[in-house]
Amino acid sequence: MTIQEYKQQLYDACKEHIFLAQQALDRYSTAKTDREREYAKIDNLQHLAAHNALQWALYKASELERRNEQ
């Protein structure tokens, strides 16, 4: 796998987690019980955390790519 392919996979995963975080936020806003809201909030936070970790990995992969080009 090339670094470009790896970066594309990271980017795709970032997009997926943002989509899932938004879905959780939508579930939170339409929740009828405190328990539903709490689960939606937890899901949202987990997807945002995953997105942030993937963004960091994407940044590091880009850094590595730049170093290899020099």
Model-identified regions with their sequence ranges:
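Short, charge/polar-rich alpha-helical segments
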Residues: 1-18
